[in-house]
Design a protein with these regions (language model features):
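Surface-exposed binding patches on compact interaction domains or structured appendages
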Residues: 45-74, 165-194
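Beta-strand-connecting loops/turns
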Residues: 32, 72, 89-90, 151, ...
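Beta-strand-rich extracellular modules
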Residues: 99-103, 202, 218-222
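Short, hydrophobic beta-strand segments
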Residues: 77-85, 197-205
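Long, low-complexity ectodomains and other extracytoplasmic segments of secretory-pathway proteins
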Residues: 1-45, 102-159, 163-164, 222-237
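Short glycine/proline/serine/threonine-rich loop/turn segments at secondary-structure transition edges
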Residues: 85-93, 205-212
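Beta-strand-rich interaction surfaces with strong enrichment in secreted/lumenal proteins
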Residues: 27, 64-69, 83-84, 146, ...
């Protein structure tokens, strides 16, 4: 097979190895679950290749099939997330590294970012709580910040309101990468109360970022336990 065939099916290249994804994401994991995902691998080198992910965190396991790929061959790595081993609610991030050849070192070229989002467990809430839940409302879920020079920063404010019937708790607030910073005035909102969420984009960190900068919020609103705010911002050449 001509290696060029894989540019469409496996668009991401790490050395002579091509992959179908550049990051490993487990979007909505519930405690106790063991979700899996597959990373498709193509060997465009002229040597036999053994797909290995290095530096796996304790909550991930990986199995490659077949264990060895001949030249021009494809296979897959099945990755399993053990949610019981995640350290906390909300977002956990790490980096794993694809071994390109035996004895390969870890570095930026073969880094694959990992993210897992563990949702709160609502199975134990009472009937009373179920009938009178908090309800989060945001003034915006997507921010347009345009272009930023490397020495610039820009901030936007979102109003967070509890339009529900019991206290709203922001259990976790995190950014997916270093291009953003967040500040939240209040973590607990009584029914009818609101607060300000300030999101700042930093031009100097934008160049290093893969994907869309995002903010993650985990709440005790059973209908909106996870909220992702996307920030459209690019680095000015």
């Amino acid at each position: 097979a001509d290696p060029k065939n894989y540019t469409f099916t496996h668009p991401f290249q790490i050395g002579a190895i091509r992959l179908n994804k550049e990051e490993i994401e487990f979007e909505d994991a519930n405690k106790g679950d063991k979700p899996t995902m597959e990373l498709l691998v193509a060997n465009t080198s002229d040597k036999l290749y053994t797909p290995v992910l290095m530096h796996l965190p304790p909550y991930l396991s990986a199995v490659a099939t077949p264990e060895k790929l001949g030249r021009g061959r494809t296979g897959k790595i099945k990755i399993t997330l053990d949610t019981d081993k995640l350290p906390k609610l909300g977002l956990t991030t790490a980096s794993v590294y694809l071994s390109r050849f035996p004895g390969d070192k870890v570095g930026e070229e073969n880094e694959i970012p990992v993210s897992a989002i563990l949702l709160p467990d609502f199975s134990h809430i009472s009937q009373q709580e179920r009938l009178n839940p908090p309800a989060i409302h945001l003034s915006a879920k997507e921010l347009q910040m345009g272009e930023l020079k490397s020495d610039e920063k820009k901030a936007h404010t979102i109003i967070v309101k509890n339009v529900g019937k019991s206290n709203l708790e922001i259990l976790d607030l995190q950014v997916f990468n270093s291009a953003l910073g967040v500040q939240l005035k209040k973590r607990v909102l009584k029914p009818g109360a609101s607060t300000k969420l300030k999101i700042t984009a930093f031009g100097q960190n934008l160049k290093k970022v893969k994907g869309t900068p995002r903010v993650l919020m985990i709440t005790n609103d059973p209908n909106n336990p996870k909220i992702i705010i996307k920030v459209k911002v690019t680095s000015k050449k």
